[in-house]
A protein has these predicted regions:
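Structural marker of alpha-solenoid helical repeat scaffolds
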Residues: 4-8, 42-44, 78, 112, ...
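Hydrophobic/aromatic packing residues within the alpha-helices of TPR/SEL1-like helical repeat arrays
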Residues: 1-4, 36, 72, 106, ...
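Residue-level recognition of tetratricopeptide repeat
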Residues: 11-12, 46-48, 82, 116, ...
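TPR alpha-solenoid repeat register
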Residues: 15, 51, 85, 119, ...
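Register position in tetratricopeptide repeats
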Residues: 25, 61, 95-96, 129-130
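Canonical tetratricopeptide repeat
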Residues: 18, 54, 88, 122, ...
Length: 160
């Protein structure tokens, strides 16, 4: 990247992306986010849903929550069928205490795929935060029924 001058052009774009990923691996999320921004500008905004997911990961680690929410919303807009984006959007909403919004996102995911086990687990977490323990345990049970491997500890802790 040092060989290129700013403003960066498409020629520098792959190197910016590589540096952003290296910075994420080195726990330099804020700098990675800046590289993702530089990449976005270098390619004149011609990016796909995966770009928004990767930049959201950097924003989340950098505690730039609104940025993370915006990037996940854009990823969903570009690829509404990828339910992992909806789960990620729900996770960010949970992080910032927007439990009702997280539930709405997860319900939309379940409309697309009623057997999406992770959505039920995340719904249960949101419901716990909202003091809806009975609903949370029902959501955890559904996640377990659908094969979510990460729900057992939650059931053990909150539903016994």
């Amino acid at each position: 990247v040092a060989r290129f001058t700013q403003p960066y052009t498409e020629e520098a774009a792959p190197y910016l992306l590589e540096r952003a990923q290296a910075r994420m691996n080195a726990d330099q999320a804020r700098n990675a986010m800046l590289d993702y921004d530089a990449y976005y500008n270098a390619v004149n905004g011609k990016v796909n849903d995966m770009f928004y997911y990767y930049r959201e990961q950097a924003a989340l680690k950098a505690k730039q929550y609104q940025r993370a929410l915006d990037d996940m919303a854009k990823a969903i807009e570009l690829n509404p069928e990828d339910l992992t984006y909806r789960a990620e959007l729900a996770v960010v909403n949970l992080r910032v205490g927007r439990y009702e919004e997280a539930l709405n996102v997860l319900k939309a995911a379940l409309e697309k795929d009623p057997k999406y086990a992770e959505a039920y687990r995340l719904m249960g977490i949101a419901q716990l935060q909202m003091k809806k323990d009975k609903e949370a345990c029902a959501s955890f049970a559904k996640a377990k029924e659908l094969g979510d491997p990460n729900v057992d500890a939650l059931i053990e802790k909150h539903c016994k």
